[in-house]
Amino acid sequence: MLHSKSACFCHILFILLFMKLLSPVISSIARLRKWRIDNWINHPVAAQREVLQHLVTSAQYTEFGRKYSFHKLFNVKEFKAVVPIHEYEDLKPYIERMMQGEENILWNEPVYWFAKSSGTSCDKSKFIPVSDESLQYNHYKANKDVLSNYYKYFPSSDLLTGKGLVVGGSHQISKVNDQVQYGDLSAVLIQNSPFWGQWLRTPELSIALLDEWETKIEKLALATADEVVTSIAGVPTW
């Protein structure tokens, strides 16, 4: 028992020292994004136009893009005049086809993951397409930008000297077919997170994605009791 506690203490000490050494490096890299974030803040309209143009250009050869002649849309005014506001029920037929494996419907990349909402309207769950590009350049890049902005104001922070306690929803991943899956958004994000995200978080996936809340809390507490936790994060859709 004594040997086990000693080994655990040494393990924690090693991680703490390692992260202490690595923290300045990571924080310096994170601050490199500062100029980009500042540019968005100083030129918000131009930034939004850039995003819109990227989306329209990328989706111009999809079924949805061809329907509304995306290849002819070059500014916000034209887009608003041609593309009507769509509610979920309007997009549902497209999404259902995507979930069956059809490609080039709403987006120009294959979509293998769908986030299932908790059903805030009409008491029905909605399925939101989550493309790989959305994961990489929306969700995960946003994490980096939040980190970058944090270090802008707290450059000497010890945030990265420990791990982030991840509190997510339940996994409950369901398969539509061999390639397409859907589940809680937090589970989709955790399941597809890059290696650096997995390295900096706790607890392990089997606990973080448990369905039963009381069981999850108990196991989470036991699993992280000896961890160095410096932050709490999650995408709680409940």
Question: Where are the predicted features?
Answer:
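Cysteine-centered motifs
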Residues: C8-C10
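Active-site phosphate/ATP/adenylate-binding loop shared across adenylate-forming ligases
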Residues: F18-A47, L52-W238
